[in-house]
Amino acid sequence: RLLTVTGVQTCALPIYALDARWKTLQREAHPDKFSAQGTAAQRVAMQWSVRINEAYQRLKDPLRRAAYLCEIAGAPIDAENNTAMPAEFLMQQMQWREALDDATTIDSLEALHQEVMQARASALDQCQQLIDVTHDFGQAAQQVRALMFVERFMKDIEARLDQFDVT
């Protein structure tokens, strides 16, 4: 029910609509609303509240939301076992890794971070199109797996940036 804030399950989910739906569902399932019905009803409400929060955390992240939509459409991500990537993507990853290894200044790291963030945004847009427009969940799952690599690489860049003392 949380994902269908607009009446349809979609990857292009406005965060304000998701937030509003989450708050509504939290109010409906709040354990205090069930105090007159006893502890068993409150316990069930608490379980629903936890599930609503877990769903919200998953859906507010665009990559996790895309992965979920692929999975419910029958295209599992299976990132642990399916690591095949297009050659072009692997070449880009190697170039970025080399750039990270060669980066010695904050400016060079920030430039690389900006480039990777732009590539991530573009890949998320493409993933959204694959899910919402063409309904090509197999290709979208491939895109999600690629984005998982990009996310990990962004964390590597951020870790290197953290090594610089910017006081």
Where are these predicted regions, by residue range?
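Short, solvent-exposed segments of well-ordered alpha helices
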Residues: 16, 39-43, 47, 80-83, ...
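Single conserved hydrophobic/aromatic residue that forms the stacking wall/gate
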Residues: 1-11
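J-domain helical core
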Residues: 14-29, 43-67
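Conserved, surface-exposed functional patches that form binding/active-site neighborhoods
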Residues: 64-114, 118
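Proline-aspartate-enriched helix->loop->beta-strand connector
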Residues: 30-32, 38
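Short alpha-helix boundary/capping elements
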Residues: 30, 60, 64, 76, ...
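Accessory regions outside conserved functional cores
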Residues: 95-167
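Generic detector of short, aliphatic-rich beta-strand segments that form the cores of beta-sheets
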Residues: 11-13, 150
